From Swiss-Prot:
Residues 5-249, 265-487 form the ABC transporter domain. Belongs to the ABC transporter superfamily. Pfam families: ABC_tran. GO terms for cellular component: mitochondrion. GO terms for molecular function: ATP binding; ATP hydrolysis activity. It comes from the Eukaryota. It is found in: Mitochondrion. Disulfide bonds: none annotated. ATP binds at G297, S298, N299, G300, S301, G302, K303, T304. This is Uncharacterized ABC transporter ATP-binding protein C323.04. SUPFAM superfamilies: P-loop containing nucleoside triphosphate hydrolases (SSF52540). Keywords: ATP-binding, Mitochondrion, Nucleotide-binding, Repeat.
């Protein structure tokens, strides 16, 4: 039986520059592969090589045996879905944080959106949409508004948008990024069911710290665009078990004793309703100096909406009972939005999606002193702060590179650094380590554990317990818009 894809000592070129040199790889019909590697290892590029996005040399060394004698083109038969890239990650839905910026007139249903994604004969469009929705357990949500989909449902909607094309091979780049435990389990079950029926065949990319799904049979490991292992999953020694020459201090087992100081943010009886749906319900929360909060909750629970209030970036802010740094928001004796944001460092998937990728890494850090993404004046104080961060996280070699030229994971890490560089009174980290290598996560933990001052506070969101730094000394959980603060 013909294999799906075959490289035989192939060099892949992009504008005559080699991406991978002399690689050999074969995807057999009964195999499901995981491409594993650190940020910048070439995972996404390798998936695009499989898709046929780059020039193979020699041309005869690369083939799609499963298409031999068929009229299907590779671009029809092979679909690539990049969950971590800017823009695409939010393509299927509107983020909670921006719900209230949207007008119902611009909303659409899931069914209409999937019909719009279909590229085949219109006569079969409805049938293909129904089948794709069934495969992703979304049939009951077809009449629903995209706005009301949770993160996990939206991820499945993105998957359905590719399945409507009926691909024979589906390439998924970091499909589990940003999903809570339940959503990861549901998605894994769906992908496993598809793989059992070989409809479609699945290849996905993962970080070294990600759990390899049960349905995966083979692993290909990449390091610096070179294959370091390919073969059965059972024989694979995970990259995280390899020895490393990178000195990384272990996380502190206990957080430093810190005196809890005065309130920085305080909210009372906060409610938020979008078109009849109560997103936040009677929230009472105070964030004080010295506190290191972990805010948890499932996808769609209201976390991001709550943080939009915390950072002063919600359009209903003026109608809410919130004090920032001891002052109410508003004219006169109140505090302005600009004053609020000047005292807060913030990173999130939304900021990453909207951040200008033409900025260099240095310029991205400098923009921390701007209330927008523009580049403010460079002063000696700012230069010293940026230089310290570049030194702290070993980023000097990339400081002059545009964000567009580095991996998505490194882009997100630069924006984490942007959130801390000016030592703001409040650091707000919404999924800061999505797609970030373990090395940099450890370095970030060491900084947060040891170098946040007693007068600073922190709030961090993550769906992975091991992405929370040891300095966390307060926890809150949000469920269906209700906040529970743990002792």
């Amino acid at each position: 039986m013909a294999s799906f894809v075959k490289f035989a000592n192939t060099t892949f070129l992009d504008a005559r520059f080699p991406l991978f040199k002399n690689v050999s790889f074969e995807l057999a019909r009964k195999q499901n592969w995981a491409i594993i590697g650190n940020t910048g290892s070439g995972r996404t590029t390798f998936l695009r090589c499989i898709q046929g996005s780059f020039t193979p040399s020699p041309s005869t060394s690369f083939s799609y045996p499963f298409l031999k004698g068929k009229s299907d083109s590779p671009w029809q038969a092979i679909q690539l879905l990049d969950f971590k890239s800017s823009g695409q990650q939010r393509a299927a839905y509107y983020s909670e944080r921006y719900h209230s910026f949207r007008d119902k007139e611009h909303d659409t249903t899931l069914e209409k959106w999937l019909l719009g994604a279909y590229r085949g004969n219109e006569k079969f469009a409805s049938q293909h949409v129904q089948e794709a929705a069934s495969m992703t357990q979304l049939s009951h949500l077809l009449p629903s508004s995209l706005i009301n989909l949770s993160n996990g449902q939206s991820r499945r909607a993105m998957l359905a948008s590719k399945l409507v094309q009926r691909p024979q091979l589906l390439l998924l780049d970091e499909p589990y990024a940003g999903l809570d435990v339940t959503s990861r389990s549901v998605l894994s079950s769906l992908l496993g069911e598809m793989s059992n029926h070989c409809s479609p065949k699945i290849v996905l990319s993962l970080r070294p710290q990600d759990k390899i799904p049960d349905f995966i049979t083979h692993v290909l490991e990449l390091k610096n665009k070179k294959i370091t292992y390919q073969g059965p999953k059972e024989q694979y020694i995970p990259m995280t078990s390899h020895s490393t020459n990178i000195p990384v201090k272990p996380q502190m087992k206990k957080s430093k004793p810190i005196t809890i100081g005065k309130p920085l943010i305080s909210m009372e009886h906060l409610n938020c309703v979008y078109w009849g749906r109560k997103v936040l319900s009677d929230i009472n929360w105070t964030i004080r100096e010295g506190e290191r909060w972990a805010l948890t909750g499932s996808n769609g629970s209201g976390k991001t909406t709550l943080l939009a209030y915390v950072v002063g970036d919600h359009p209903k802010l003026f109608a809410s009972n919130i004090k920032f740094f001891g002052k109410s928001i508003g004219p006169g004796t109140g505090i302005s939005i600009f004053d609020i944001q000047e005292n807060i460092g913030h990173c999130s998937p939304e900021i990453h999606n909207h951040f200008p990728k033409q900025h260099t890494c240095f310029e991205a850090l400098l923009s921390a002193w701007s209330t927008t993404f523009t580049i403010p004046k460079l002063t000696e104080t700012r230069l010293a702060a940026i230089s310290s961060i570049l030194e702290e996280f070993e980023l000097k070699d990339i400081k002059d590179k545009p964000l567009s030229s580095i991996s998505v994971g490194m882009q997100r890490f630069i924006l984490f650094c942007r959130a801390i560089v000016k030592q703001p009174r409040l650091v707000v980290l919404d999924e800061p380590f999505q797609g970030v290598d373990t090395k940099y996560v450890h370095m970030a933990h060491n900084y947060l554990n040891e170098k946040l001052s007693p007068s600073q506070a922190m709030v961090i969101i993550s769906h992975y317990e091991d992405e929370l730094p040891a300095c966390v000394n307060r926890r809150a959980h949000i469920d269906n818009g209700k906040l529970v603060i743990h002792a």
